[in-house]
Amino acid sequence: MLKQRTIKSIVKTVGIGLHSGRKIELTLRPAAPGTGIVFSRIDLPTPVDIPASAMSIGDTRLASVLQKDGARVSTVEHLMSACAGLGIDNLYVDVTAEEIPIMDGSAATFVFLIQSAGIEEQNAPKRFIKVTKPVEIRDGDKFARLDPYFGFKLKFSIDFRHPAVDKTGQELEVDFANTSYVREIARARTFGFAHEAEMLRELGLARGGSMDNAIVLDEYRILNNDGLRYDDEFVKHKMLDAIGDLYVVGHPLLASYTAYKSGHGLNNALLRELLAHEDAYEIVTFDDPQAAPKGFAFDAQTAFA
């Protein structure tokens, strides 16, 4: 059977919070089959476990924020994206603040941590959410949509009227049957505009933001000396975010995702719309790994390879 996966050993790192600017300790621990991805605020007087789920997402203005009993963990999307890309079903994430450290602004550090810990198959079937009917959410000209598809495919379009973004491409389509998440998506960094960063700092946000963890643009150009990691890094990062946003549903999706100018809020609304219609999806497993869509029958170290 196609099995669930966790990590083999505990792994730790330290990083800076994007919004707080504080040093944050992050620990990833193996979890039993059926656990899911569980974030734990170990800095609180009484630690609070917050399982990743579509219904636990609260604030989505600047990131995907998990909330439970007054506790919150912000900026979970990059780590969730890495878990999706490496096929991790079960994991404990211990964190000493209310946000996941931003690291380099991509999912690459989290991929490295998980691969360093080692990936272990577990004696339980991997459960997929198979979309059986189209589901769509719109907000003005923005939309996000899921269609039935035997695999995992994404098409994302952005619309940033900026010379540097225009030159790199505003649309990307990826089918993970023939695309490596680790090589083609994981290293794409978050991006922002210098004038917006100043406004956020005045509001007490983005205190940890810098060119070490984001692509920063002025009105005309990219300010980072090292330029871009991918020719189309902007739209690839939006896709990286979407993969993480969708993975909070609790299982990998078998679906085609299409989006125009979507963000954390619309992605979460799409998941809630899907879950609200029980006839739009079913839970499936694969007794024969070779019967699973290409890209999911991966080896022990890579997914979507």
UniProtKB/Swiss-Prot annotation:
The record places the active site at H264
Zinc in keyword set: yes
The record ties this protein, via Gene3D superfamilies, to: lpxc deacetylase, domain 1, lpxc deacetylase, domain 2
| Keywords from the UniProt entry | Hydrolase, Lipid A biosynthesis, Lipid biosynthesis, Lipid metabolism, Metal-binding, Zinc
Top-level taxon of origin? Bacteria
The EC number(s) given in the record are 3.5.1.108
Q: Which reaction does it catalyse?
A: a UDP-3-O-[(3R)-3-hydroxyacyl]-N-acetyl-alpha-D-glucosamine + H2O = a UDP-3-O-[(3R)-3-hydroxyacyl]-alpha-D-glucosamine + acetate
**What is the uppermost EC class here?**
hydrolase
Gene Ontology molecular function, alphabetical: metal ion binding; UDP-3-O-acyl-N-acetylglucosamine deacetylase activity
Q: Which GO terms describe its cellular component?
A: membrane
Q: Which GO terms describe its biological process?
A: lipid A biosynthetic process
InterPro entries reported for this sequence: Ribosomal_Su5_D2-typ_SF, UDP-acyl_GlcNac_deAcase, UDP-acyl_GlcNac_deAcase_C, UDP-acyl_N-AcGlcN_deAcase_N
Biological function? Catalyzes the hydrolysis of UDP-3-O-myristoyl-N-acetylglucosamine to form UDP-3-O-myristoylglucosamine and acetate, the committed step in lipid A biosynthesis.
Please report which protein family the annotation says this sequence is part of: Belongs to the LpxC family.
Q: Which PANTHER family match?
A: UDP-3-O-ACYL-N-ACETYLGLUCOSAMINE DEACETYLASE 1, MITOCHONDRIAL-RELATED
Query: What protein name is recorded for this chain?
Result: UDP-3-O-acyl-N-acetylglucosamine deacetylase
Q: Which organism is it from?
A: Burkholderia ambifaria (strain MC40-6)
